[in-house]
Amino acid sequence: VAVKCATITPNAARMTEYQLKEMWKSPNGTIRAILDGTVFRKPIIVKGIEPYVSNWKKPITIARHAYGDIYKNTELTVPAGATAELLITKADGSQERALIHEFKDAGIVQGVHNLDSSIRSFARACFNFALDQKEDIWFATKDTISKKYDHRFKDIFAEIYETEYQSKFEKAGIEYFYTLIDDAVARVIRSEGGFIWACKNYDGDVMSDMVATAFGSLGMMTSVLVSPEGTYEYEAAHGTVTRHYYKYLKGEITSTNSIATLFAWTGALRKRGELDGNTPLCSFADKLEQAAIQTIEDGIMTGDLYRLSTLPNKRSVDTETFLKEIALHLDALL
């Protein structure tokens, strides 16, 4: 069980700012690839923060595949007149070659990959999580366009569902639903929530932010990476909140929503308690979450939530005051 802080993925500007030797790949992508896990992100719902999508009544959990796609890509800039090809060299030395593009003008090319084993782990993690939560699970790709890459995801999910989970789902009264990613987006917006939406890595990255913001704030989103071996890594779903950090460095007071970071710690403490049979630790995690929610529902919140809240009596406080108020609520519960 681990807790991870927010990290940057450097671009050209960050390379200069932090004097980096190279444009390092995403730290999150690297960790996810090593653990071969699935990221589950779920909004934290509180009274007074109404979803932008008025018909959403229940949380929507995003299950994000944590391996491959653009997060483990290889990409190059291509000069005019060059030819880009996809080359597979097999174990026996034979090769398979496919033309990507003949570049009349300068351009770019990118190679992405995935593994059947990782997709299978992802599928099983999603189906197990759906059974545990007793919620329907949706999965979507663009298999009509990506007839090898995305279609592989669709086929593996269907195979594992039909051979390992269909009878369990029927017994639990839940269902597995597959559709195209664009259709899924439309269906999600029309739904009332209350299901798990399984997404490929990039889709999950984008849609988890959309769902979190539509429910209120990216600062109100839990995130846990679960590996097939039973490793749990909790983190805030948002990034490093760079603008607030720069203000902090200048000595300015910020009003930074720390709920997602707080819930990363409570999630990890609860899981550690569950694994160790430590009931008091689980209880402490539950009460800390309860204290955080009560603080917001009592009208004490950070600036981002203040702008969203429909509570009649509310006030915006700075980061330190917000945490102190949560501590006071926690003391009352302990």
Region roles according to the model:
Residues 86-179:
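Glycine-rich phosphate/diphosphate-binding loop of Rossmann-like nucleotide-binding domains
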Residues 303, 307-334:
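Phosphate-binding loop/pocket of nucleotide- and phosphate-handling active sites
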Residues 133-141, 165-178, 273-285, 295-308:
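Flexible, glycine/charged-enriched surface loops at secondary-structure junctions
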Residues 26, 40, 49, 55-59, ...:
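Short coil/turn connectors at secondary-structure junctions
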Residues 1-95, 202, 206:
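N-terminal glycine-rich phosphate/adenylate-binding segment common to multiple enzyme folds
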Residues 188-287, 291-297:
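Glycine-rich phosphate/nucleotide-binding loop
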Residues 13-18, 72-77, 148-153, 188-191, ...:
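Short acidic, glycine/serine/threonine-rich loops at helix termini
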